[in-house]
Design a protein with these regions (language model features):
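Long, intrinsically disordered, low-complexity segments
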Residues: 203, 397, 401-402, 444-501
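Conserved, well-structured interaction surfaces
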Residues: 46, 89-167, 190, 194-198, ...
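Membrane-proximal, proline-rich intrinsically disordered regions
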Residues: 21-78, 276, 319, 465, ...
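Hydrophobic-face positions in mid-chain alpha helices that act as interaction patches
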Residues: 70, 243-252, 264-402, 464-465, ...
């Protein structure tokens, strides 16, 4: 049989002697590896799996386009004007903001995202195929073997859900049907098979179920908290170093959070609520919470502020050079660092002062997001244009996190799917307490809840690429900041590009 070759970004994991999280992810080399030999060793599986995570962190996927820029531009979140001569990577966001899909720049964005998503899926398929062929026996420990396979299924599901949310039809009461490939191919020579919405969702659910089964009794998160698994050196509590830093991997609770996200997107709010509550209440065998909501401990430290809420991440990507991608795009230097930061609207994504005011309209002034998340940066004419500090790290920092699934989302899903106002108010009070807001006014109707939820998604997940999907699943007609342009069902369906890869 003809051997298939694939170029993988293979990260060589130091099985012993980790000195930092960057050691875990950053010792990497581009090599072309014979796929028939790669999975003959545990190190081969490690490299292939870590290569998947490395690909997700690229700027063409979650490093920028799927989080900070393009997908949030589709939600019309960034303040942009047609009269400004933007740099190309900002201009493309203007076209997305006004939903002009006919522009070459827009089409290039869609092709880039689409191809990179399916390329990342193909790499997960290579790992899954290796297990189907019995190569998993090269991983001696049965639990580690199950975790690696479970992560591959979880990643494949994660990617396919985002393909569906971006390029698929609206999930509820669709009048326009879209078929999409659910990729299980392991070579670029193979043709992708297209599926109807229902067929696609069935495969997505099957992958999530498989990931859950493999991870449930084998993932170290059953025994330890995320914080304990992030300990380094002699403090590591597991024998296999590859099983540490579970917040940066598709762990069991990340898969459950993904499942809750999926069911909420599909309109099954009750099931989404129930799963989200399981994640919220998750504990180790010792009864310790696996993860808790981020608080002032993340946002308000005098040093090493971490605005991207890493402590509450259920799944995130580690990005060693986050400053190099976030600062040129977002600026976002906190006033606590310098009051002289300058923004250039041709180069940076910003808000206007009125938009920022509206974003936090009616919010308690103690809300740590309004206090720490945004910086009132000025342009060369001293005009203020707020920039987001979520991804700010110092230029010399070696730490950076891109959140992909957070506990805050589980709270908002649980609130939206709750059956009583009492439960809604209890959950929302806990959620807001983590933002240093003590509530005195409570929701009196479910309509009030829905109105507030759209505002909360916007405040909480700005620059994380989630707002467009919230609008899409609700088929929202008028987007915040872009009410002059009415959305319709067709505008929520991103045109499928001409090429798969």
């Amino acid at each position: 049989m003809k051997k298939k070759y694939i170029s993988l970004l293979l990260s060589v994991l130091l099985v012993g002697g980790f000195t930092s999280c960057s050691d875990w992810l950053d010792v990497e080399q581009n090599i072309e590896k014979d796929a028939d030999e790669m999975f003959d060793t545990y190190d081969g599986f490690k490299g292939a799996l870590t290569g998947c995570y490395s690909d997700l962190a690229k700027t063409d996927l979650y490093g920028t386009r799927m989080t900070m820029s393009n997908v949030d531009a589709l939600a019309s979140l960034w303040y942009m004007e047609g009269s400004i001569d933007y740099r190309d990577n900002i201009q493309e966001n203007y076209y997305l903001r006004v939903h002009d899909y006919s522009q070459t720049m827009s089409q290039d964005v869609f092709q880039t995202i689409y191809s990179n998503l399916y390329n990342a899926v193909l790499e997960t398929n290579m790992i899954i195929k290796a297990f189907h062929e019995g190569k998993g026996v090269s991983i001696a420990d049965a639990a580690s073997r199950a975790v690696v396979e479970g992560e591959a299924y979880g990643l494949r599901a994660f990617l396919h859900l985002d393909i569906l949310r971006l390029f698929g039809q609206v999930p509820v009461n669709a009048t326009l049907q879209v078929s999409l490939p659910y990729s299980e191919i392991t070579s670029y020579d193979e043709n992708l098979t297209y599926y109807t919405f229902d067929e696609y969702v069935a495969k997505l659910k099957a992958d999530i179920e498989q990931a859950k089964t493999l991870l449930k009794d084998n993932d170290p998160v059953a025994l330890y908290t995320y914080a304990e698994l992030n300990e380094l050196g002699d403090e590591v509590l597991v024998d296999d170093d590859f099983m540490t830093f579970r917040q940066y991997r598709m762990n069991y609770w990340a898969v459950r959070a993904l499942e809750a996200r999926m069911y909420m997107y599909l309109g099954d709010k009750t099931r989404a609520h129930d799963i989200a509550m399981e994640v919220i209440n998750a504990t180790t065998t010792d009864g310790d919470p696996v993860v808790t909501l981020s608080s002032n401990l993340d946002y308000g430290q005098a040093t090493n502020r971490r605005y991207m809420s890493p402590s509450e991440c259920l799944f995130s990507l580690y990005y060693d050079d986050l400053y190099e991608i976030s600062y040129p795009l977002l600026c976002g230097v906190p006033t606590s660092v310098t009051t002289l930061s300058s923004v250039n609207r041709q180069n940076n994504l910003t808000l206007s002062t009125s938009w920022k005011t509206d974003l936090f309209l009616g919010c308690d002034p103690n809300d740590i997001r309004s206090r720490f998340m945004w910086s009132d940066t000025r342009d060369s004419q001293s005009n203020v244009y707020p920039t987001i500090s979520k991804y700010y790290v110092s230029e010399n920092s070696t730490s950076g996190v891109i959140p992909l699934l957070r506990l805050s989302e589980m709270y908002l899903i649980a609130i939206e799917g709750a059956s009583t106002l009492d439960e809604v108010n209890t959950l929302y009070s806990t959620y807001m307490a983590s933002k240093e807001v003590s509530r005195t006014d409570y929701f009196k109707s479910m309509n009030e809840v829905i109105t507030e939820l759209s505002k909360e998604y916007r405040r909480e997940f700005f620059a994380e690429g989630q707002m467009f999907y919230y609008y899409k699943r609700n088929n929202t007609r008028n987007l915040w900041s872009n009410e002059s342009m009415a959305m319709d069902e067709g505008l929520y369906i991103i045109p499928n590009p001409d090429r798969d890869f």
